[in-house]
A protein has these predicted regions:
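Fungal secretory targeting signals
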Residues: 1-19
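N-terminal, motif-rich segments that launch catalysis or mediate targeting to/interaction with membranes
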Residues: 17-136, 143-268, 273, 278-307
Protein backbone atom coordinates (compact mmCIF):
# COMPACT_ATOMS: atom_id res chain seq x y z
CA UNK A 1 0.00 0.00 0.00
CA UNK A 2 2.67 2.49 -0.96
CA UNK A 3 1.87 6.20 -0.86
CA UNK A 4 -1.25 5.55 1.21
CA UNK A 5 -1.58 7.08 4.65
CA UNK A 6 -2.14 4.83 7.64
CA UNK A 7 -5.56 6.35 8.22
CA UNK A 8 -6.63 5.74 4.64
CA UNK A 9 -5.32 2.22 4.72
CA UNK A 10 -7.33 1.46 7.83
CA UNK A 11 -10.48 3.05 6.44
CA UNK A 12 -10.16 0.95 3.31
CA UNK A 13 -9.40 -2.30 5.07
CA UNK A 14 -12.95 -3.52 5.49
CA UNK A 15 -13.59 -3.30 1.77
CA UNK A 16 -10.19 -4.75 0.98
CA UNK A 17 -10.63 -8.00 2.84
CA UNK A 18 -14.06 -9.08 1.63
CA UNK A 19 -13.13 -10.78 -1.63
CA UNK A 20 -16.10 -12.05 -3.61
CA UNK A 21 -18.44 -11.09 -0.75
CA UNK A 22 -20.25 -13.81 1.19
CA UNK A 23 -21.99 -15.20 -1.89
CA UNK A 24 -18.78 -15.60 -3.86
CA UNK A 25 -16.99 -17.30 -0.99
CA UNK A 26 -19.90 -19.64 -0.42
CA UNK A 27 -19.86 -20.52 -4.12
CA UNK A 28 -16.14 -21.34 -4.03
CA UNK A 29 -16.76 -23.62 -1.06
CA UNK A 30 -19.74 -25.35 -2.63
CA UNK A 31 -17.80 -25.98 -5.86
CA UNK A 32 -14.97 -27.50 -3.82
CA UNK A 33 -17.39 -29.67 -1.85
CA UNK A 34 -18.55 -31.27 -5.10
CA UNK A 35 -15.04 -32.57 -5.85
CA UNK A 36 -13.77 -33.74 -2.46
CA UNK A 37 -12.28 -37.23 -2.22
CA UNK A 38 -13.55 -39.52 0.59
CA UNK A 39 -11.02 -38.72 3.32
CA UNK A 40 -11.08 -35.01 2.59
CA UNK A 41 -14.87 -35.02 2.63
CA UNK A 42 -14.90 -36.87 5.95
CA UNK A 43 -12.47 -34.37 7.48
CA UNK A 44 -14.48 -31.39 6.19
CA UNK A 45 -17.77 -32.76 7.49
CA UNK A 46 -16.35 -33.68 10.90
CA UNK A 47 -14.30 -30.52 11.29
CA UNK A 48 -17.00 -28.04 10.28
CA UNK A 49 -19.92 -29.85 11.88
CA UNK A 50 -23.54 -28.79 11.96
CA UNK A 51 -22.71 -25.10 12.50
CA UNK A 52 -21.61 -24.93 8.86
CA UNK A 53 -23.84 -27.73 7.61
CA UNK A 54 -20.69 -29.88 7.26
CA UNK A 55 -19.84 -27.91 4.13
CA UNK A 56 -17.13 -25.60 2.81
CA UNK A 57 -19.89 -23.43 1.31
CA UNK A 58 -21.35 -21.92 4.49
CA UNK A 59 -17.86 -21.84 6.03
CA UNK A 60 -16.40 -19.83 3.16
CA UNK A 61 -17.19 -16.31 4.49
CA UNK A 62 -16.06 -17.10 8.05
CA UNK A 63 -12.66 -15.39 7.79
CA UNK A 64 -14.40 -12.15 6.77
CA UNK A 65 -17.08 -12.45 9.42
CA UNK A 66 -14.51 -12.65 12.23
CA UNK A 67 -12.93 -9.33 11.25
CA UNK A 68 -15.26 -7.61 13.72
CA UNK A 69 -13.55 -9.59 16.49
CA UNK A 70 -10.43 -7.68 17.54
CA UNK A 71 -8.82 -10.95 18.57
CA UNK A 72 -8.39 -11.57 14.84
CA UNK A 73 -7.04 -8.15 13.87
CA UNK A 74 -3.75 -9.82 13.00
CA UNK A 75 -5.40 -11.70 10.12
CA UNK A 76 -6.39 -8.64 8.06
CA UNK A 77 -3.18 -8.48 6.03
CA UNK A 78 -3.43 -12.17 5.15
CA UNK A 79 -6.33 -11.75 2.72
CA UNK A 80 -4.28 -10.31 -0.14
CA UNK A 81 -0.88 -9.74 -1.68
CA UNK A 82 -0.10 -6.19 -2.81
CA UNK A 83 1.26 -6.61 -6.33
CA UNK A 84 3.17 -3.38 -6.99
CA UNK A 85 2.63 -3.34 -10.75
CA UNK A 86 0.98 -0.94 -13.23
CA UNK A 87 -2.30 -2.23 -14.67
CA UNK A 88 -3.57 -2.21 -17.33
CA UNK A 89 -0.17 -1.82 -19.03
CA UNK A 90 1.85 -4.18 -16.85
CA UNK A 91 0.82 -6.91 -14.41
CA UNK A 92 3.08 -9.09 -12.29
CA UNK A 93 3.45 -10.73 -8.89
CA UNK A 94 6.84 -10.95 -7.23
CA UNK A 95 7.08 -12.80 -3.93
CA UNK A 96 10.10 -10.84 -2.66
CA UNK A 97 8.71 -7.48 -3.75
CA UNK A 98 5.06 -7.95 -2.80
CA UNK A 99 5.31 -10.10 0.34
CA UNK A 100 8.63 -8.91 1.72
CA UNK A 101 7.46 -8.93 5.34
CA UNK A 102 6.05 -12.44 5.04
CA UNK A 103 2.54 -11.28 5.89
CA UNK A 104 0.33 -11.91 2.87
CA UNK A 105 -2.08 -14.44 1.46
CA UNK A 106 0.73 -16.58 0.04
CA UNK A 107 2.35 -17.22 3.42
CA UNK A 108 -1.09 -17.57 5.02
CA UNK A 109 -1.97 -20.46 2.71
CA UNK A 110 1.36 -22.07 3.54
CA UNK A 111 0.83 -21.67 7.28
CA UNK A 112 -2.69 -23.08 7.32
CA UNK A 113 -1.75 -25.91 4.99
CA UNK A 114 0.74 -26.96 7.64
CA UNK A 115 -1.68 -26.46 10.52
CA UNK A 116 -4.69 -28.25 9.04
CA UNK A 117 -2.79 -31.57 9.07
CA UNK A 118 -0.85 -30.96 12.30
CA UNK A 119 -1.87 -33.75 14.65
CA UNK A 120 -0.39 -31.86 17.60
CA UNK A 121 -3.10 -29.22 17.27
CA UNK A 122 -6.56 -29.48 18.79
CA UNK A 123 -9.62 -30.26 16.67
CA UNK A 124 -10.69 -26.62 17.05
CA UNK A 125 -7.32 -25.36 15.81
CA UNK A 126 -7.41 -27.67 12.80
CA UNK A 127 -10.97 -26.57 12.08
CA UNK A 128 -9.88 -22.95 12.16
CA UNK A 129 -7.05 -23.76 9.76
CA UNK A 130 -9.54 -25.39 7.39
CA UNK A 131 -11.79 -22.34 7.44
CA UNK A 132 -8.87 -20.04 6.72
CA UNK A 133 -7.78 -22.23 3.81
CA UNK A 134 -11.34 -22.32 2.48
CA UNK A 135 -11.40 -18.54 2.52
CA UNK A 136 -7.86 -17.66 1.44
CA UNK A 137 -7.81 -19.98 -1.56
CA UNK A 138 -11.04 -18.27 -2.57
CA UNK A 139 -9.51 -14.82 -2.03
CA UNK A 140 -6.57 -15.73 -4.22
CA UNK A 141 -8.81 -15.85 -7.29
CA UNK A 142 -10.15 -12.29 -6.89
CA UNK A 143 -7.92 -10.15 -9.15
CA UNK A 144 -8.06 -7.13 -6.86
CA UNK A 145 -6.76 -9.17 -3.93
CA UNK A 146 -3.58 -9.53 -5.97
CA UNK A 147 -3.19 -5.81 -6.69
CA UNK A 148 -1.83 -2.76 -4.84
CA UNK A 149 -3.05 -0.03 -7.21
CA UNK A 150 -5.36 2.39 -5.39
CA UNK A 151 -5.55 0.06 -2.39
CA UNK A 152 -6.74 -2.84 -4.49
CA UNK A 153 -9.25 -0.64 -6.34
CA UNK A 154 -10.91 0.65 -3.17
CA UNK A 155 -10.08 4.25 -4.07
CA UNK A 156 -11.48 4.02 -7.61
CA UNK A 157 -15.08 5.25 -7.77
CA UNK A 158 -17.31 3.57 -10.35
CA UNK A 159 -21.00 2.99 -11.04
CA UNK A 160 -23.04 -0.21 -11.11
CA UNK A 161 -26.63 0.02 -12.32
CA UNK A 162 -26.56 3.75 -11.64
CA UNK A 163 -25.32 3.41 -8.06
CA UNK A 164 -21.95 4.63 -6.82
CA UNK A 165 -19.49 2.05 -5.54
CA UNK A 166 -15.78 1.36 -5.86
CA UNK A 167 -13.94 -0.98 -8.19
CA UNK A 168 -13.03 -3.43 -5.43
CA UNK A 169 -16.60 -3.72 -4.16
CA UNK A 170 -17.83 -4.07 -7.73
CA UNK A 171 -15.66 -7.13 -8.21
CA UNK A 172 -16.34 -8.48 -4.72
CA UNK A 173 -20.09 -8.48 -4.93
CA UNK A 174 -21.65 -5.87 -7.23
CA UNK A 175 -21.36 -7.81 -10.47
CA UNK A 176 -22.21 -11.09 -8.73
CA UNK A 177 -25.40 -9.55 -7.31
CA UNK A 178 -26.50 -8.41 -10.77
CA UNK A 179 -25.57 -11.75 -12.31
CA UNK A 180 -27.39 -13.94 -9.80
CA UNK A 181 -30.47 -11.71 -9.46
CA UNK A 182 -31.61 -13.53 -6.31
CA UNK A 183 -30.21 -16.94 -7.21
CA UNK A 184 -28.48 -18.69 -4.29
CA UNK A 185 -24.76 -19.28 -4.01
CA UNK A 186 -25.39 -23.02 -3.78
CA UNK A 187 -27.38 -23.06 -7.01
CA UNK A 188 -24.77 -20.97 -8.80
CA UNK A 189 -21.99 -23.25 -7.56
CA UNK A 190 -23.93 -26.29 -8.72
CA UNK A 191 -24.07 -24.82 -12.22
CA UNK A 192 -20.33 -24.10 -12.18
CA UNK A 193 -19.52 -27.62 -10.96
CA UNK A 194 -21.66 -29.07 -13.76
CA UNK A 195 -19.66 -27.06 -16.30
CA UNK A 196 -16.46 -28.60 -14.95
CA UNK A 197 -17.92 -32.10 -15.15
CA UNK A 198 -19.86 -31.73 -18.40
CA UNK A 199 -17.10 -31.99 -20.98
CA UNK A 200 -17.42 -28.36 -22.05
CA UNK A 201 -14.87 -25.54 -21.95
CA UNK A 202 -14.37 -25.69 -18.19
CA UNK A 203 -13.86 -29.45 -18.32
CA UNK A 204 -11.21 -29.09 -21.02
CA UNK A 205 -9.34 -26.52 -18.92
CA UNK A 206 -9.72 -27.98 -15.43
CA UNK A 207 -6.57 -30.08 -15.41
CA UNK A 208 -4.53 -26.95 -16.13
CA UNK A 209 -6.12 -25.12 -13.19
CA UNK A 210 -4.39 -27.40 -10.69
CA UNK A 211 -0.90 -27.29 -12.16
CA UNK A 212 1.92 -24.98 -11.16
CA UNK A 213 2.81 -24.04 -14.72
CA UNK A 214 5.26 -21.19 -15.19
CA UNK A 215 6.45 -20.86 -18.81
CA UNK A 216 9.46 -18.79 -17.71
CA UNK A 217 10.73 -21.44 -15.30
CA UNK A 218 13.05 -24.35 -15.96
CA UNK A 219 11.44 -27.55 -17.15
CA UNK A 220 11.64 -29.25 -13.75
CA UNK A 221 9.89 -26.35 -12.01
CA UNK A 222 7.40 -25.90 -14.80
CA UNK A 223 6.26 -29.50 -14.46
CA UNK A 224 5.89 -29.41 -10.67
CA UNK A 225 2.56 -30.98 -9.70
CA UNK A 226 0.27 -29.73 -6.96
CA UNK A 227 0.90 -32.94 -5.03
CA UNK A 228 4.68 -32.47 -5.26
CA UNK A 229 4.37 -28.83 -4.28
CA UNK A 230 2.46 -29.65 -1.10
CA UNK A 231 4.54 -32.64 -0.03
CA UNK A 232 7.86 -30.86 -0.65
CA UNK A 233 6.55 -28.00 1.49
CA UNK A 234 5.37 -30.24 4.33
CA UNK A 235 8.67 -32.12 4.35
CA UNK A 236 10.68 -28.90 4.53
CA UNK A 237 8.71 -27.62 7.56
CA UNK A 238 9.46 -24.04 6.46
CA UNK A 239 6.57 -21.57 6.26
CA UNK A 240 7.18 -20.03 2.86
CA UNK A 241 4.93 -19.49 -0.19
CA UNK A 242 4.24 -22.62 -2.18
CA UNK A 243 4.75 -22.72 -5.94
CA UNK A 244 1.13 -23.36 -6.93
CA UNK A 245 -0.49 -20.50 -4.96
CA UNK A 246 2.15 -18.12 -6.35
CA UNK A 247 1.31 -19.16 -9.91
CA UNK A 248 -2.41 -18.91 -9.15
CA UNK A 249 -1.83 -15.40 -7.80
CA UNK A 250 -0.11 -14.50 -11.07
CA UNK A 251 -3.07 -15.96 -12.95
CA UNK A 252 -5.56 -13.82 -11.02
CA UNK A 253 -3.36 -10.74 -11.32
CA UNK A 254 -3.25 -11.09 -15.12
CA UNK A 255 -6.96 -10.22 -15.22
CA UNK A 256 -6.15 -6.81 -13.72
CA UNK A 257 -4.54 -5.98 -17.05
CA UNK A 258 -6.86 -7.85 -19.40
CA UNK A 259 -10.21 -7.02 -17.77
CA UNK A 260 -10.45 -5.27 -14.40
CA UNK A 261 -8.68 -2.00 -15.25
CA UNK A 262 -10.04 -1.68 -18.80
CA UNK A 263 -13.08 0.35 -17.68
CA UNK A 264 -13.96 3.72 -19.18
CA UNK A 265 -14.33 6.59 -16.72
CA UNK A 266 -17.96 7.58 -16.23
CA UNK A 267 -19.45 4.44 -17.76
CA UNK A 268 -21.77 2.08 -15.90
CA UNK A 269 -19.72 -1.06 -15.36
CA UNK A 270 -22.73 -3.31 -14.80
CA UNK A 271 -23.78 -2.94 -18.43
CA UNK A 272 -22.24 -3.55 -21.83
CA UNK A 273 -19.03 -5.30 -22.76
CA UNK A 274 -17.22 -4.57 -19.49
CA UNK A 275 -19.94 -6.35 -17.53
CA UNK A 276 -19.98 -9.28 -19.95
CA UNK A 277 -16.22 -9.73 -19.71
CA UNK A 278 -16.30 -9.34 -15.93
CA UNK A 279 -18.97 -12.03 -15.57
CA UNK A 280 -16.92 -14.47 -17.64
CA UNK A 281 -13.86 -13.75 -15.52
CA UNK A 282 -15.64 -13.95 -12.18
CA UNK A 283 -17.40 -17.22 -12.97
CA UNK A 284 -14.17 -18.72 -14.26
CA UNK A 285 -12.22 -17.61 -11.19
CA UNK A 286 -14.83 -18.87 -8.73
CA UNK A 287 -14.90 -22.23 -10.54
CA UNK A 288 -11.09 -22.39 -10.59
CA UNK A 289 -10.69 -21.62 -6.90
CA UNK A 290 -13.34 -24.12 -5.88
CA UNK A 291 -11.67 -26.82 -7.96
CA UNK A 292 -8.25 -25.85 -6.63
CA UNK A 293 -9.48 -25.90 -3.04
CA UNK A 294 -10.82 -29.42 -3.54
CA UNK A 295 -7.54 -30.55 -5.11
CA UNK A 296 -5.59 -28.99 -2.23
CA UNK A 297 -7.59 -30.79 0.44
CA UNK A 298 -7.61 -34.05 -1.51
CA UNK A 299 -3.81 -34.06 -1.62
CA UNK A 300 -3.62 -33.36 2.10
CA UNK A 301 -6.10 -36.04 3.18
CA UNK A 302 -6.20 -38.56 0.31
CA UNK A 303 -2.65 -38.31 -1.00
CA UNK A 304 -3.45 -36.98 -4.47
CA UNK A 305 -5.80 -34.61 -6.26
CA UNK A 306 -8.16 -37.45 -7.31
CA UNK A 307 -9.66 -35.21 -10.00
Amino acid sequence: MKAVSAALALSSLAGRVVAWGAVGHEAVGYVAQAFLAPNALDFVQTSLGSKFNESLGPAGPWADEIKSNHAYDWSSALHYVDAEDSPPSSCSVDEERDCADGKCILTAIANYTSRVVDQDLTDAEQSEALKFLDHFIGDLGQPLHVEATKVGGNEIKVKCNGKSTNLHSLWDSGIITVLLNGKSAESWASDLAKRIKSGGVYASQASDWITCADPSATLSRRDLSLREDIWMFLESRAIKPLKCPLEWAKDANSYDCSTVFTYKNGSDLCTGSYYDDAVKTIELQVAKQGYRLAAWLNVLFDGDTNL
